[in-house]
């Protein structure tokens, strides 16, 4: 029987591994900040393709990777879709008030 390749799971930093410099760098890009704002406004996970970003697929993938590796979002696969959710509780634990300050600016 032929084996079907399985996509690797996403890696996410643990709460104590989230670094302020990485979070601020990720939030410094207008497209990534837009993604975070949309995720903050939705309680349910959103598919990467549901964001109205005026960028190509590889750039979109890059932005989500930066957000995930910084610890801002958590991603999981749902069939062929990648669902993203904001790690609000983890960020509030690590950096109290930071996310609210950024989102209200």
Question: Residue spans of the language-model regions?
Answer:
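Conserved acidic functional residues
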Residues: 29, 63, 96
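Canonical helix-turn-helix DNA-binding module
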Residues: 49-72
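N-terminal helix-turn-helix DNA-binding core of bacterial DNA-binding proteins
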Residues: 21-56, 78-90
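Short, Lys/Arg-enriched N-terminal segment that forms or immediately precedes the first helix
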Residues: 3-24
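Conserved segment of winged-helix/HTH DNA-binding domains
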Residues: 16-20, 83-105
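Generic N-terminal simple sequence motifs
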Residues: 1-4, 92
């Amino acid at each position: 029987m032929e084996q079907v390749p399985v996509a690797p799971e996403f890696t996410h930093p643990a709460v104590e591994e989230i670094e302020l410099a990485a979070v601020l760098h990720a939030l410094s890009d207008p497209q990534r900040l837009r993604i975070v704002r949309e995720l903050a406004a939705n309680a349910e996970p959103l598919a990467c393709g549901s964001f109205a970003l005026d960028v190509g697929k590889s750039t979109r993938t890059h932005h989500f990777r930066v957000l995930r590796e910084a610890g801002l979002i958590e991603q999981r696969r749902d069939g062929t879709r990648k669902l993203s959710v904001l790690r609000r509780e983890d960020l509030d634990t690590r950096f109290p008030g930071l996310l609210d300050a950024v989102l209200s600016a």
